[in-house]
From Swiss-Prot:
Gene3D superfamilies, per database record: 6.10.160.10, Ribosomal protein L20
GO MF annotations, alphabetized: rRNA binding; structural constituent of ribosome
Coiled-coil stretches: none
Keyword set, alphabetical order: Ribonucleoprotein, Ribosomal protein, RNA-binding, rRNA-binding
UniProt record, GO biological process: ribosomal large subunit assembly; translation
Domain of life assignment: Bacteria
SUPFAM superfamilies: Ribosomal protein L20
Listed name of the protein: Large ribosomal subunit protein bL20
Function: Binds directly to 23S ribosomal RNA and is necessary for the in vitro assembly process of the 50S ribosomal subunit. It is not involved in the protein synthesizing functions of that subunit.
Any Gene Ontology CC annotation: ribosome
Family: Belongs to the bacterial ribosomal protein bL20 family.
PROSITE patterns, A to Z: RIBOSOMAL_L20
């Protein structure tokens, strides 16, 4: 059986990692050993943050809805309770957008929630 030298395979593997590490600072983009660690860590951060992004956006939407609700004389929790009682099914993303960009429409929704709560 012929002896197999791994030069081609090793070069391909190294090129793949260094391509993924392109744009990293210093040795992280040039030295294979360091680049491999950086790419693995970047993958871990990306995996974690894809999940955190959902939580962070929900928190942002809630903060915006709360600010909009309080300008209309209602707290966030009371607004959500009022919307549930009035069977108005608008998700937080849309509510937050209305609170920021369409203040009149948001105020109308808050008034409906207030009417049900009173």
């Amino acid at each position: 059986m012929a002896r197999v030298k791994r030069g081609v395979i090793a070069r391909k593997r190294h090129k793949k990692i260094l391509k993924l590490a392109k744009g990293y600072y210093g040795a992280r983009s040039r030295v294979f050993r360091v680049a491999k660690q950086a790419v693995i860590k970047a993958g871990q951060y990306a995996y974690r943050d894809r999940r955190q992004k959902k939580r962070q956006f929900r928190a942002l939407w809630i903060a915006r809805i709360n600010a909009g609700a309080r300008t209309n004389g209602l707290s966030y929790s009371r607004l959500i309770a009022g919307l549930k009682k009035a069977s108005i099914e608008i998700d937080r993303k849309v509510l937050a957008d209305l609170a920021v960009n369409e203040k009149a429409a948001f105020a109308a929704i808050v008034e409906k929630a207030k009417a049900v709560l009173a």
